[in-house]
């Protein structure tokens, strides 16, 4: 009986290894198909983890927090196909603790970010969050972040050339006479491609044609830091601009935004005629200025500036880096033991890898030739990634290192 048990224990590992060799390829294909379908379903289906609930003491509680959902909605606007990758310079008015600039600097294509705030203490306390020391990973494109102190209504010359203007929860804190100056500074002085204002006020739906776009319910007045006169003043000033600008409604996929539509609304003023503009010609250009901009308009004070290190790479190098990172991610997802020589191959659909480089190219044949030229095996639109050679080299190198260390220790011991 004991001999039989020992025999079963001896052959158990061999049996499991054989079954793993037979079933692992089918499991990998099935897992990759599930992974691919999950990526595709993320854009189509709403996130079930986004919801809101009511608490008797705290009121409405949002998951994730409301400011995170608002930031996500603004980023969705900036990633619109009409100007995605074309926004070189962006200004965030009233950024306070720089919580949104941390998201803004990850948007592709942006090379310059301006932060303007009237308060000095939050600027000095929060500016260390954007530290870019020598240990930070290098970016693909240059990025400069400038923190400025001043009134957002002042037409400072550094605002010239901004492609996007963002003001999050700011207009309800401004004085009535500054609101009118702000509108003229944004739409008459800067003249960006896109302007985004957010406010906790209960706006009427812009698409319905109601001109009182900033009218809100009286029961929410005690929660705001502004008066009815301030909001109506801003609304009255913007009414004259609606005839010259195309107003788009922000359609957000998250259901919670629809449920709390009476609490928050975003105005996205898209300057008409964007497609007709020459990309090489600045929209802010005024022929009365000539070639020199009015640099005498120095209203803001520089608090701090950051220049992030960057490394210029070719498109082929960027494609290879992104594909390599995606392969490593899938390998770490599939393999439990990276040193196992039994799990020696992984087949990755080429179409799945194209999703990671779609912002660079959509030429499948070019990517296929690039992978084959760099040593990857592509068979029937499947990239064959083998780790057998890598694992053998790793194991052998470790054994050699151990042997060398043992020999050296022996020599030292006997000497």
Swiss-Prot record:
Keyword annotations of the record: Cytoplasm, Magnesium, Metal-binding, Methyltransferase, RNA-binding, RNA-mediated gene silencing, S-adenosyl-L-methionine, Transferase
SUPFAM superfamilies: S-adenosyl-L-methionine-dependent methyltransferases (SSF53335)
Top-level taxon of origin: Eukaryota
Entry keyword Disulfide bond: no
Enzyme nomenclature, EC number: 2.1.1.386
Residues reported to bind Mg(2+): 169, 172-173
Compartments where found: Cytoplasm
UniProt cofactor note: Binds 1 Mg(2+) ion per subunit.
GO cellular-component term (any): cytoplasm
One annotated GO biological process: piRNA processing
Any GO molecular function: RNA binding
Binding site for S-adenosyl-L-methionine: 99, 117
Cofactor(s), names only, from the UniProt record: Mg(2+)
Predominant place of localization: cytoplasm
Catalytic activity of the protein: small RNA 3'-end nucleotide + S-adenosyl-L-methionine = small RNA 3'-end 2'-O-methylnucleotide + S-adenosyl-L-homocysteine + H(+)
UniProt keyword Metal-binding present: yes
Any coiled-coil regions, as ranges: none
Family note: Belongs to the methyltransferase superfamily. HEN1 family.
Job description of the protein: Methyltransferase that adds a 2'-O-methyl group at the 3'-end of piRNAs, a class of 24 to 30 nucleotide RNAs that are generated by a Dicer-independent mechanism and are primarily derived from transposons and other repeated sequence elements. This probably protects the 3'-end of piRNAs from uridylation activity and subsequent degradation. Stabilization of piRNAs is essential for gametogenesis.
PANTHER family xrefs: HEN1, SMALL RNA 2'-O-METHYLTRANSFERASE
Protein's name according to its UniProt entry: Small RNA 2'-O-methyltransferase
Species the sequence originates in: Bombyx mori (Silk moth)
Lineage: Eukaryota, Metazoa, Ecdysozoa, Arthropoda, Hexapoda
